[in-house]
């Protein structure tokens, strides 16, 4: 039966250790400045992240003006807008401590309706919009993960070390070709188990089979220049996503992707106009799950062991039977 390596109190202390170390190194190595993040945005701005395009944001109206607002799903679009508004230049970037509510999340060991992540974004030049630049950025972030594991091992040697020296890169099409008989999720399990750490490139567009590896909104990532960082989780014995990131759409890729998804109505939103008219800067960015990080590096079996959220009674009871104590 599962046995946590730390008490609840010890876990809370270690969570701070994980978050403080990672935040400090992320800012230094990617040259990012921390900024304040919104909890909600106006509906008409188009700044909310609509994820896979089907999740419903929490909406409410403001007493003062009656304007419709939405609780953010993530800050994927807001960050790009903020870089423009704050006057950042190529090579400069920002990050935020993002908190969100995703009401339509399907709850399980790795998913909660409460989302906390380091949301970051950086301005790039046109010639940097390449797979090579994407991979170099992934390697920088992976280096932070490696150093975090070493740092924790010095304080908590019983946590062990599992990450390989290097992260492996593979495209979603190469992954389908390698495991044509498997579902996309099972492909992720297979490749993560084989290598320990992998970055899957190119998520959102249809593969040669006609199926997508996974869904992605049409208006933030360029589907050819994005991907997910996956580790093999030693406790769950499955693939485990730590980050979704990518080079963002330019006017050409946004135009193509909105057409593919049948979302031409979004062309009238301020954010989308800013990209189509080349007003907003070209960027790269992503979200790095804070609870996901804590869950992996503290070797936890459930995300509820590292964050406070609301869980159905039947799920709490099932966890208790498995010796999993939720916050």
Swiss-Prot record:
Could you list this entry's UniProt keywords, alphabetically sorted: Amino-acid biosynthesis, Asparagine biosynthesis, ATP-binding, Cytoplasm, Ligase, Nucleotide-binding
Q: What is its EC number?
A: 6.3.1.1
* Single GO BP term: L-asparagine biosynthetic process
InterPro entries, from UniProt?
Answer: aa-tRNA-synth_II, aa-tRNA-synth_II/BPL/LPL, AsnA
Q: What class of enzyme is it?
A: ligase
What cellular component GO annotations does this protein have?
A: cytosol
Q: Indicate where this protein resides in the cell.
A: Cytoplasm
Which pathway does this polypeptide act in?
Amino-acid biosynthesis; L-asparagine biosynthesis; L-asparagine from L-aspartate (ammonia route): step 1/1
GO MF term (any one): catalytic activity, acting on a protein
Q: Which reaction does it catalyse?
A: L-aspartate + NH4(+) + ATP = L-asparagine + AMP + diphosphate + H(+)
Which family is annotated?
Answer: Belongs to the class-II aminoacyl-tRNA synthetase family. AsnA subfamily.
**Per its UniProt record, what PANTHER family does this chain match?**
ASPARTATE--AMMONIA LIGASE
Q: What is this protein called?
A: Aspartate--ammonia ligase
């Amino acid at each position: 039966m599962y046995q946590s390596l730390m008490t609840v109190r010890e876990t809370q202390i270690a969570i701070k250790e994980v978050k403080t170390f990672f935040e400090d190194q992320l800012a230094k190595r990617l040259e990012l400045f921390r900024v304040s993040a919104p909890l909600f945005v106006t509906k008409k701005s188009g700044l909310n992240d609509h994820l896979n395009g089907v999740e419903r944001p929490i909406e409410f109206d403001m007493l003062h003006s009656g304007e419709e607002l939405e609780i953010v799903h993530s800050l994927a679009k807001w960050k790009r807008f903020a870089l423009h508004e704050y006057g950042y230049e190529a090579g400069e970037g920002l990050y935020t401590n993002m908190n969100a509510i995703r009401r339509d999340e399907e709850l399980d060991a790795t998913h909660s309706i409460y989302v906390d992540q380091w949301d970051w974004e950086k301005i790039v030049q046109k010639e940097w919009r390449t797979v090579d630049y994407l991979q170099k950025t992934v390697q920088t972030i992976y280096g932070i993960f490696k150093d975090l594991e070493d740092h924790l091992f010095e304080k908590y040697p019983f946590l062990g070390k599992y990450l390989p020296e290097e992260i492996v890169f593979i495209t979603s099409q190469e992954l389908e070709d390698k495991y044509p008989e498997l579902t996309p999720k099972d492909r992720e399990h297979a490749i993560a188990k084989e290598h320990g750490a992998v970055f899957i490139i190119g998520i959102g567009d249809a593969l040669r089979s006609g199926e997508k590896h996974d869904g992605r909104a049409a208006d933030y990532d360029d589907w050819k220049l994005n991907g997910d960082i996956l580790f093999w989780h030693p406790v769950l014995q499955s693939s485990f996503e730590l980050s979704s990131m990518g080079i963002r759409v330019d006017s050409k890729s946004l135009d193509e992707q909105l057409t593919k998804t049948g979302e031409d109505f979004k062309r009238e939103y301020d954010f989308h106009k800013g990209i189509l008219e080349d007003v907003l800067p070209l960027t790269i960015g992503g979200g790095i799950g804070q609870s996901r990080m804590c869950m992996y590096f503290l070797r936890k079996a459930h995300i509820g062991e590292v964050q406070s959220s609301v869980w159905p009674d039947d799920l709490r009871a099932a966890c208790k039977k498995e010796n999993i104590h939720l916050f």
